[in-house]
């Protein structure tokens, strides 16, 4: 069945090609085609044959044609052939040539009044460029432009805007007229786009080989980055060869996104381009709407078109070029025009015109024929063919095809949108079924371990590592929704990445730049420097700079009570107590006070010290001081003690109720102002680059960052900076160091610190964010960003955050000291020193008491001789009695022992008065201590003694063997001591009849009377 049309076509072709113009034929059409467009001639003759077989249009009339082939870039040849056709007599001229030759034919047609239907043809199938102004449609011109104006600039600009491209390269082949995209370049320049141009030589292999031979490695890497986004103004054949070459030489990767724009892209070309390309491919081509009724697709204007041309599934129809379609519709339009002219009986016969003959007149029927053609319109292979007042065809439609995402080269192609001059872009270039198309796609993810974003959850020998963290949870949420899978690995150098001196990038960013990974995931911040080499999704968490510091340690200081004063001050106070005590003693010794009868002076050095100490601690003194010098001294001392004690009390309250913060840093400004506490960050990180840029850039220099940069960059950055964040956190915890890093990371560290010894300080200004990095031009960026926004809108992102940053943390993240249970209560540690001093005093007192008891018992075990005891006790008695005789004002009284009567003494009461015993030393430089007693009865006895009896004492039967003598001096304690001139003789003991007194074993008594 398919053989017959082909045979019929060949028979018709040969018969028309060699058939001369019939003398009785009134319809003659001339045609001039480019010599390389043999297919135009084939379709032209096929259209004439179809119309000659259709009796409904021209009835009995037949169309005859004359075809000439010319060089498309030779205007003189085109004019010469056109004149030859006009000399034969033609009703219309059809041409399918380039703009250069068309301009000459336009002038000739205007001069000869021959309707000229021009079908612009681009050389070698390259995209069309607008013809020069002299070749464009004018209202009074005889040239009609069958093909619509060139709208490629408008279409490609809207596509690029839809893709939000900011940087790309345009490739064009040698046959393309670069002047055709002048308007497009102007539009991109106004939008601030960075567009590069590169001409593709005819020998593509040699061109690529030359680039590899002449470019350095760094230049090739940059060139690969440029190729991620490209627009190709090429013929389908050149585009196939170019794509094949760059893919085989590994100049492009699966993240590339290319746009091929050309009206002349057939269905077969689309399939071949998709098969050869990788990444995402977008194709823009002209399309022709088909009737929705499939049975009417080959019936147009009462004319049945050849099935091989109108059936989209027919291979011959798929191979049709756009110029072929317009040529067929042009013949159909002329046939309908001739039909109307015949019906209106306004037919003008053909005339033989001479272009060379001088004074040749134009065709008289040309104007009428032109108006009839312009008013007509047909629906053919190009949908609707008609002309406006300017003589151009306004009907044009474009379709935008796009490949699915993924690495499978056998993926399909779908229509993403359409475009026309009236409605513009109709549709979206985003594949709505992307989530289904990503199923089966395996992404290679590079990461850097950073708590809590990415952590190793399980590491079993021989099995792949398992990761967890906030960023991993976000990636899993995307994978579950979009259907892709991923393989994850850690960056070899464990760095986020920065640009090196040679222009290359290291770390995680370097893995993306060198195409070793598809996605970069961690606590990765979005910075302008990184955005210049990689693409980022929208931020999934805000970012701010923070500082990690160690809280002030609440150490147990048992002697915190001594903290208000410095050790040197305490030493001065102790020395002052000793000095003042000594001065008080000396002042009293030099000018002793006058004591009343019966008083005992206690102004010893020990008592003076005790008095000064007691007054210092506000406990008062026991010994009265009456001299003016001593009182003056004590008054000044009390004033001194008042000031010292008041100052101590106030400072002690401050020390015990207010925690002294060693590190009072509450903001980045506080950190920058101080220099005592060193601080730093991670080398080659975003924080490092941020501090450096704001601290050194003269256009955005910040004083705070300038101070921080001086500290961070000390000794070239090696002193205060670390290689990874874990090292910085460790330095803070176990040393004097402040770590400047991402606030989110530091908050997680402070929350999970076992002893809650860390706190954070941040600026709370989220000028940046965390995002997922992808290769430049990655097709996954937009859909990832869209899904992240959905997670944020429905609250799922907040749930993931609470998993790693809980609100009910046991640690206070922002307090520089440990929290207390009560704001006013003081703990035992604040007063431990006081209790220790008290305990030490108790122990020391017990020890002294033990020593005293031991010493007393040891002293009592040494029993003295009776002679010594008798002599000393009796002598003491004399002294004590003399001290009671206050009637006589003489300081030196002489007594006679015979005048003293001891009989009235109640000796039974003497043992009860043992508490009145007193240790006195009345004998200087003798080292003899006498033990005596002053019973209450002796005071009564002293009152009965007369001043006259002071000359001597009657002791009854006691014989006085003592040689009397005067006492020359009074002892300081109020008693007497022996004169250094007279030496008292011993008084022998004589028994006196009296009751027996039993003192028991009294160790304090040496003599019994």
UniProtKB/Swiss-Prot annotation:
Positions contributing to Ca(2+) 2 binding: 753, 755, 757
Residues that hold Ca(2+) 1 according to the record: 531, 534-535
Membrane side Extracellular: residue ranges: 24-566, 657-830
Membrane topology: Multi-pass membrane protein
Molecular function per GO: AMPA glutamate receptor activity; metal ion binding; transmitter-gated monoatomic ion channel activity involved in regulation of postsynaptic membrane potential
Topological domains annotated Cytoplasmic: 588-635, 852-1009
Main location class: membrane
SMART domains: Lig_chan-Glu_bd, PBPe
Gene Ontology terms: cellular component: AMPA glutamate receptor complex; dendritic spine; plasma membrane; postsynaptic density membrane
Region feature (Disordered): 989-1009
UniProt-listed Pfam families: ANF_receptor, Lig_chan, Lig_chan-Glu_bd
Catalytic activity: Ca(2+)(in) = Ca(2+)(out); Na(+)(in) = Na(+)(out)
Location within or outside the cell: Postsynaptic cell membrane
Superkingdom: Eukaryota
GO biological process: modulation of chemical synaptic transmission; synaptic transmission, glutamatergic
Free-text note on domains in this protein's UniProt record: The PDZ-binding motif mediates interaction with GOPC.
Quaternary state and interactors: Tetramer; dimer of dimers.
Family: Belongs to the glutamate-gated ion channel (TC 1.A.10.1) family. GRID2 subfamily.
Function: Member of the ionotropic glutamate receptor family, which plays a crucial role in synaptic organization and signal transduction in the central nervous system. Although it shares structural features with ionotropic glutamate receptors, does not bind glutamate as a primary ligand. Promotes synaptogenesis and mediates the D-Serine-dependent long term depression signals and AMPA receptor endocytosis of cerebellar parallel fiber-Purkinje cell (PF-PC) synapses through the NRX1B-CBLN1-GRID2 triad complex.
This protein's name: Glutamate receptor ionotropic, delta-2
Taxonomic classification: Eukaryota, Metazoa, Chordata, Craniata, Vertebrata
Annotated gene: grid2
């Amino acid at each position: 069945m398919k053989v017959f049309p082909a045979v019929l076509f060949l028979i018709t072709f040969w018969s028309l090609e060699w058939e001369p113009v019939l003398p009785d034929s009134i319809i003659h059409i001339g045609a001039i085609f480019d010599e390389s467009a043999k297919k135009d001639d084939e379709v032209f003759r096929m259209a004439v044959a179809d119309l000659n077989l259709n009796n409904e249009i021209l009835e009995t009339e037949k169309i005859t044609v004359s075809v000439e082939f010319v060089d498309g870039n030779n205007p003189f040849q085109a004019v010469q052939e056109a004149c030859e056709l006009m000399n034969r007599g033609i009703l219309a001229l059809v041409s399918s040539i380039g703009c250069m030759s068309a301009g000459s034919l336009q002038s000739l047609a205007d001069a000869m009044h021959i309707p000229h239907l021009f079908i612009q043809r681009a050389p070698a199938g390259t995209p069309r460029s607008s013809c020069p102004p002299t070749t464009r449609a004018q209202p009074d011109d005889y040239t009609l432009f069958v093909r619509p104006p060139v709208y490629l600039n408008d279409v490609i600009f809207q596509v690029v805007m839809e893709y939000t491209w900011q940087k790309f390269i345009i490739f064009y082949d040698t046959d393309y007229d670069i002047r055709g995209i002048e308007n497009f370049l102007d539009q991109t320049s106004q939008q601030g786009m960075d567009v590069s141009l590169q001409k593709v030589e005819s020998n593509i292999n040699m061109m690529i080989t030359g680039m590899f031979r002449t470019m350095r490695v760094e230049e090739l890497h940059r060139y690969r980055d440029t190729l991620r986004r490209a627009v190709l103004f090429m013929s389908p054949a050149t585009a196939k060869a170019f794509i094949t070459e760059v893919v085989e030489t590994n100049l492009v990767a699966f993240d590339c996104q290319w746009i091929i724009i050309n009206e002349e892209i057939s269905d077969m070309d689309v399939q071949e381009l998709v098969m050869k390309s990788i990444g995402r491919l977008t194709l823009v081509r002209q399309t022709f709407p088909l009737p929705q009724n499939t049975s009417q697709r080959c019936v147009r204007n009462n004319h049945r078109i050849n099935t091989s041309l109108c059936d989209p599934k027919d291979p011959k129809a798929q191979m049709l070029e756009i110029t072929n379609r317009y040529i067929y519709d042009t013949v159909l339009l002329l046939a309908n025009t001739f039909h109307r002219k015949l019906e209106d009986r306004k037919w003008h016969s053909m005339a033989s015109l001479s272009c060379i003959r001088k004074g040749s007149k134009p065709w008289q029927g040309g104007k009428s024929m032109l108006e009839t053609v312009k008013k007509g319109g047909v629906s053919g292979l190009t949908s609707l063919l008609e002309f406006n007042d300017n003589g151009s065809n306004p009907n044009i439609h474009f379709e935008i095809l796009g490949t699915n995402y993924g690495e499978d080269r056998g993926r399909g192609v779908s229509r993403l949108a359409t475009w026309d001059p009236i409605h513009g872009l109709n549709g979206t270039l985003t594949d709505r079924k992307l989530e289904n198309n990503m199923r089966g796609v395996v992404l290679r993810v590079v990461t850097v371990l950073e708590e809590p974003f990415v952590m190793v959850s399980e590491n079993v020998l021989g099995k792949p590592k398992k990761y967890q963290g906030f960023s991993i949870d976000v990636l899993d949420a995307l994978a579950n929704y979009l259907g892709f899978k991923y393989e994850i690995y850690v960056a070899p150098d464990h760095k986020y990445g920065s640009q090196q001196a040679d222009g290359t990038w290291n770390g995680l960013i370097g893995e993306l730049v060198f195409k070793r990974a598809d996605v970069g995931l961690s606590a990765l911040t979005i910075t302008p420097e990184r955005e210049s080499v990689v693409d980022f999704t929208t931020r999934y968490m805000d970012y701010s700079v923070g500082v990690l510091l160690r809280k002030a340690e609440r150490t147990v200081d048992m002697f915190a009570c001594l903290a208000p004063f410095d050790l040197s001050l305490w030493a001065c106070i102790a020395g002052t107590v000793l000095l003042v005590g000594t001065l008080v003693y000396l002042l009293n010794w030099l000018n002793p006070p006058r004591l009343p009868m019966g008083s005992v002076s206690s102004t010893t050095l020990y008592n003076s010290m005790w008095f000064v100490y007691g007054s210092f601690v506000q406990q008062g003194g026991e010994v009265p001081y009456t001299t003016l010098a001593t009182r003056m001294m004590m008054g000044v001392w009390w004033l001194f003690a008042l000031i010292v004690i008041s100052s101590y009390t106030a400072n002690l309250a401050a020390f015990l109720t207010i925690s002294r913060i060693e590190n009072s840093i509450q903001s980045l400004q506080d950190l920058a102002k101080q220099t005592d506490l060193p601080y730093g960050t991670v080398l080659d990180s975003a924080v490092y680059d941020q501090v450096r840029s704001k601290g050194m850039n003269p256009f955005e220099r910040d004083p705070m960052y300038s101070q921080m940069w001086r500290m961070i960059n000390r000794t070239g950055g090696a002193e205060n900076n670390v290689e990874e964040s874990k090292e910085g956190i460790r330095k803070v915890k176990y040393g004097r160091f402040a770590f400047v890093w991402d606030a989110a990371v530091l908050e997680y560290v402070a929350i999970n610190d076992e002893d809650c010894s860390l706190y954070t300080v941040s600026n709370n200004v989220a000028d940046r964010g965390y995002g997922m990095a992808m290769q430049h031009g990655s097709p996954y960026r937009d859909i990832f960003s869209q899904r992240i926004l959905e997670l944020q809108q429905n609250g799922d992102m907040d749930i993931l955050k609470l998993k790693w940053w809980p609100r009910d943390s046991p640690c206070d993240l922002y307090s520089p000291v440990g929290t207390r249970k009560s704001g006013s209560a003081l703990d035992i540690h604040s007063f431990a020193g006081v209790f220790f001093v008290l305990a030490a005093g108790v122990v020391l007192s017990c020890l002294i008491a033990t020593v005293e008891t031991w010493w007393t018992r040891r002293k009592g075990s040494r029993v003295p001789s009776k002679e010594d005891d008798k002599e000393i006790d009796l002598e003491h008695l004399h002294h004590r009695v003399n001290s009671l005789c206050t009637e006589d004002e003489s300081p030196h009284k002489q007594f006679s022992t015979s005048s003293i009567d001891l009989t009235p003494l109640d000796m039974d009461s003497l043992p009860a008065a043992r508490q009145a015993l007193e240790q006195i030393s009345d004998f200087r430089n003798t080292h003899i201590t006498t033990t005596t007693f002053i019973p209450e009865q002796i005071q009564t006895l002293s009152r009965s003694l007369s001043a006259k009896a002071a000359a001597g004492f009657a002791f009854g039967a006691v014989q006085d063997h003592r040689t009397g003598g005067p006492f020359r001096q009074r002892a300081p304690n109020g008693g007497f001591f022996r004169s250094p001139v007279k030496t008292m003789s011993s008084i022998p003991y004589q028994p006196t009849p009296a009751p027996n007194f039993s003192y028991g074993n009294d160790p304090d008594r040496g003599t019994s009377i």
